[in-house]
């Protein structure tokens, strides 16, 4: 494995044995490369002859020593010393001296001029004299340096440094010292200590929801998730305090009453107390006088006078002809409107002897009874009652404005009324049960039963209806057969339920469950959401499983403990979702481990891709590395949204020092398990 550089170091990242091993690998690789380079004699740097001072040398064959000696002793080509003396003697001493003097003068002049030059005639560079990093700028003098060194205004003292190092490091305001303006949608309860401002309606959990006024917020955090929040409304000069208690429990907003607020409340209370116009709209029923009319009350004397008058009138009425018992069989014509009021008794013999009179009474109930004639002061209406003594039945009739009497009407007694009521109820029940059964009202059949789940909700009948969904229906219902309940109030208030047929004869619960969806005329059907009959799978392992160092290892869960809907694929060690929704995924592994550096990371994969970290076990390098047993457990639970057909698997990354292979232990389902619980709901789209 090649050396991999880590470039995302954080200040507080720990250095573990993996990092040290990676560095040692890089150093070893560098030494190997350097040794190979050192032994490379094929000019690895591509050095040229000019770079080593041989730029003028041609790449041609040189003379051998023998050839050089032959050339050196060739007297034809070379002169002898005698010949040289003879040739040198050709110059006169004076001429030679002149030339020598001239050459000396020229040499001195050239040397003096060269020595006097300050323009770097040899073109020496600052790098050649060891000053390659020095900039060509004026340097400070010693006096300047000493003056700077003693300047206490630009240097800090040890006391100042200690004070600043001990200062608070949390920024409470903006860099300009002003309050920090919050972004829209910020939740006030999540803010850290500081001073903030925002428009009330643009943030979450403002004391007054939807308030367009500006607010200031002072927040101070405490330990264990506690914090104090003070909110001020700028425009109204109002203040609230909110407390977040231990573990983030928000205790609500409490408004702080100012003197203006208290004075205003007191003023309103005073006005209310002195308001005599019934400000609470109290009714006479509320004070127990519901039967009292809104009229002037009588004085005691007036009331007594009216009571005396009423008493006398009642006596007169009692003594009137209304309740006088007339002589037996004392009438011959009951239709006579001028008969005096009173009670007349007519017996059977008398009635039988006077058939004309008898026929004036109710047919078949006219043998013996009491005729009561009520008094009528102006003859506007005259009433008669006939009570049949033999049948205990009461009849009544009326003559209006001097006309003839109407026919007789029976005044029903309680028993007769109850009998008629019972008969009417029985007739009504019989009619409803015959014509309006629950099945006829709510169960849709034939063409009325909509079988295609894609049909518009506008096409359904109003009310609560039921429909059977036949086998092998693939139009969009959650299962291929079951039944549907429709609850439709309008095209904008329509909810539909789908129920499986609950067939569990195969040992699976895949046909048990309830789903719900909604219809809105402008947007159509929502997706189905499962609300009952959730799947549950609990899977264990068999035997030990070797874990490959430095890799993500798929765990071979293959022992079914529970699989309610038969959704677990033991061949591929994965759970496959039957319907869209949320799922709670839990997993646990018990790993054989030793007392050495180790790192185990438990992941859930969705459709073959890493989705979420569930748990991590990391043991730093101990001071006494050994291969003694020190087993590790990684356990975690996460929520996972899935669509129908999506699958989840469990992987573990394995890292450790040493050469002892790590294994998943051969343990029962209490230690090694893969547990999936369907939660229902919907797999909402990501933002």
From Swiss-Prot:
InterPro entries to which the protein is assigned, alphabetical: Tumour_necrosis_fac-like_dom
SUPFAM superfamilies per record: TNF-like
Family to which the UniProt record says this protein belongs: To B.subtilis YqcC.
Official protein name in the record: Phage-like element PBSX protein XkdV
Organism, scientific name: Bacillus subtilis (strain 168)
Lineage of source species: Bacteria, Bacillati, Bacillota, Bacilli, Bacillales
Gene name in the database record: xkdV
């Amino acid at each position: 494995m090649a050396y991999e550089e880590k470039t995302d170091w954080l200040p507080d990242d720990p250095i573990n044995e993996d990092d040290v091993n990676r560095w040692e690998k890089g150093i070893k690789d560098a030494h190997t490369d350097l040794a190979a380079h050192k032994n490379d004699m094929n000019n690895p740097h591509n050095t040229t002859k000019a770079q080593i001072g041989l730029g003028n040398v041609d790449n041609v064959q040189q003379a051998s020593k023998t050839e050089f000696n032959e050339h050196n002793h060739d007297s034809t080509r070379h002169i002898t010393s005698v010949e040289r003396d003879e040739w040198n003697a050709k110059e006169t001493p004076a001429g030679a001296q002149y030339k020598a003097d001239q050459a000396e003068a020229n040499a001195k002049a050239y040397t003096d001029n060269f020595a006097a030059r300050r323009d770097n005639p040899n073109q020496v560079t600052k790098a050649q004299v060891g000053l390659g990093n020095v900039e060509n700028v004026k340097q400070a003098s010693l006096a300047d340096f000493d003056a700077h060194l003693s300047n206490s205004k630009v240097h800090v003292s040890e006391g100042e440094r200690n004070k600043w190092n001990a200062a608070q490091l949390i920024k409470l305001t903006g860099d300009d010292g002003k309050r920090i303006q919050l972004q829209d949608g910020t939740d006030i309860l999540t803010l850290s200590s500081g001073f903030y401002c925002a428009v009330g309606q643009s943030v979450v959990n403002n004391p007054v929801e939807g308030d367009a006024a500006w607010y200031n917020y002072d927040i101070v955090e405490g330990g264990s998730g506690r914090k104090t929040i003070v909110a001020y409304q700028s425009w109204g000069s109002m203040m609230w305090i909110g407390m977040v208690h231990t573990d983030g429990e928000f205790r609500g907003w409490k408004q702080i009453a100012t003197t203006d607020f208290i004075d205003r409340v007191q003023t309103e209370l005073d006005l209310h107390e002195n308001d005599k116009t019934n400000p609470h709209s109290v009714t006479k029923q509320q004070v127990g006088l519901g039967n009292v009319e809104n009229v002037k009350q009588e004085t005691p004397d007036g009331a007594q006078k009216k009571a005396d008058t009423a008493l006398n009138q009642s006596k007169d009425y009692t003594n009137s002809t209304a309740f006088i018992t007339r002589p037996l069989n004392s009438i011959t014509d009951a239709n006579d409107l001028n008969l005096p009021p009173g009670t007349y008794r007519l017996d059977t013999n008398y009635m039988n002897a006077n058939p004309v009179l008898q026929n004036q009474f109710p047919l078949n109930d006219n043998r013996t009874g009491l005729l009561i004639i009520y008094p009528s002061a102006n003859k506007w209406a005259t009433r008669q009652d006939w009570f049949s003594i033999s049948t205990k039945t009461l009849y009544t009739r009326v003559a209006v404005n001097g006309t003839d009497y109407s026919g007789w009407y029976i005044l029903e007694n309680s028993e007769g009324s109850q009998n008629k009521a019972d008969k009417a109820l029985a007739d009504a029940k019989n009619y409803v049960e015959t014509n309006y059964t629950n099945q006829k009202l709510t169960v849709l059949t034939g063409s009325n039963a909509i079988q295609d789940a894609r049909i518009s909700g506008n096409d359904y009948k109003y009310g609560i209806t039921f429909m059977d969904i036949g086998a092998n229906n693939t139009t969009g219902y959650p299962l291929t057969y079951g039944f549907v309940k429709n609850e439709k109030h309008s095209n904008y208030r329509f909810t539909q339920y789908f129920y499986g047929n609950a067939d569990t004869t195969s040992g699976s619960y895949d046909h048990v469950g309830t789903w719900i969806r909604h219809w809105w005329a402008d947007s159509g059907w929502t997706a189905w959401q499962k609300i009952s009959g959730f799947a549950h799978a609990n899977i264990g392992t068999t035997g030990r499983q070797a874990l490959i160092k430095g890799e993500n290892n798929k765990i071979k869960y293959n022992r079914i403990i529970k699989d309610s809907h038969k959704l677990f694929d033991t061949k591929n060690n994965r759970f496959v979702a039957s319907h869209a929704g949320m799922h709670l995924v839990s997993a646990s592994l018990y790993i054989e481990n030793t007392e050495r550096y180790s790192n185990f990371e438990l992941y859930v994969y969705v459709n073959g891709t890493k989705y979420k970290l569930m748990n991590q076990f990391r043991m730093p390098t101990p001071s006494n590395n050994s291969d003694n047993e020190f087993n590790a457990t990684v356990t975690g639970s996460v929520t996972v949204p899935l669509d129908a057909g999506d699958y989840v698997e469990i992987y573990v990354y394995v890292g450790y020092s040493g050469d002892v292979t790590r294994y998943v232990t051969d343990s029962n389902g209490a230690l090694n398990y893969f547990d999936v619980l369907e939660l229902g709901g919907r797999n909402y789209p990501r933002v």
